[in-house]
Regions:
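Glycine/tyrosine- and acidic-biased, solvent-exposed loop/turn segments at the edges of beta-strands
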Residues: 1-91
Length: 91
């Protein structure tokens, strides 16, 4: 399954499922958005993750976390670029 936000109705309530594999978009109720590749329901591969406060991460993900090469840009203009492991900048 892949696509843009899969909406599922269960017990008369709607819930949003992450695409299982391939390209897709996942939007959280608090305004965070991920657009990119999924593997087995997790962010995995290249993607863009944005927060309502203006932060944007563009880069690689593995098992739902920032892993690999990527750049985090903050709304004040600060840029953190390099290699990420478990969502932390390491080099």
């Amino acid at each position: 399954m892949s696509g843009v936000i899969d909406l599922v109705k269960k017990n008369n309530k709607s819930s949003i499922n992450k695409p299982r594999n391939g390209l897709g978009t996942y939007a959280y109720p608090d305004g965070r958005i991920y657009v990119g590749e999924f593997k087995e329901g997790s962010f995995h591969g290249r993607g863009i993750y944005s927060w309502p406060d203006g932060r944007v991460y563009v880069g690689e993900f593995k098992n739902g976390k920032r892993n690999g090469e990527g750049t985090l840009t903050r709304p004040q203009g600060k840029v953190e670029s390099g290699r990420w492991e478990n969502s932390k900048l390491v080099a």
